[in-house]
């Protein structure tokens, strides 16, 4: 089973109100791959395993990816790569996350979602853009045979300042001194 194709058939029409837009559909496919990879990690999924998440819980994405800088980067990258305005991309991402979880729970049935996804990651790996590796737990990257060392490192903001000395000519007052 290709989970990304399934989500594209079931979730995308809801998010796009049954319209067909290649850029938005492609954006959502990449988002689905990233979300599936996050849910495949036991530590990530177990935080939501017994939670009731409403389909319209737009704050769910904030809990799924708690680092605000990661959320911002994810939205900016998707927006840039698929030429969709950032505000609209943010809305699509926030609306998609709970629907994806609901659909994954349905597919998994009585099996824990992360366990179910572990056996379906091969169909997801090729859909994850390299810039998104930083959002995927290293254990999941390993299951997909993606070298975690190749993932973008998480870097805190670094500021570097330098002093530059500039020579200015001295006024000529005449005389020796």
State the predicted function of each range.
Residues 1-177:
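A structural "flexibility-hinge" signal
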């Amino acid at each position: 089973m290709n989970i990304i194709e399934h989500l594209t058939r079931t979730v995308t029409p809801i998010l796009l109100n049954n319209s067909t837009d290649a850029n938005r559909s492609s954006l959502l496919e990449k988002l689905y791959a990233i979300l599936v990879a996050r849910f495949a990690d036991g530590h990530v999924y177990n935080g939501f395993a017994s939670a009731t998440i409403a389909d319209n819980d737009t704050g769910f994405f904030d809990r799924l990816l708690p680092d605000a800088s990661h959320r911002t980067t994810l939205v900016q990258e998707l927006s840039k790569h698929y030429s969709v305005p950032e505000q609209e991309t943010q809305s699509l991402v926030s609306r998609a996350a709970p629907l994806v979880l609901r659909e994954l729970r349905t597919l998994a049935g009585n099996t824990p979602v992360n366990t179910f996804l572990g056996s379906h990651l091969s169909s997801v790996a090729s859909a994850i853009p390299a810039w998104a590796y930083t959002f995927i737990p290293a254990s999941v990257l390993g299951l997909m045979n993606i070298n975690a060392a190749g993932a973008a490192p998480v870097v805190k903001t670094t500021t570097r300042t330098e002093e530059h000395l500039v020579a200015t000519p001295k006024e000529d007052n005449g005389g020796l001194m």
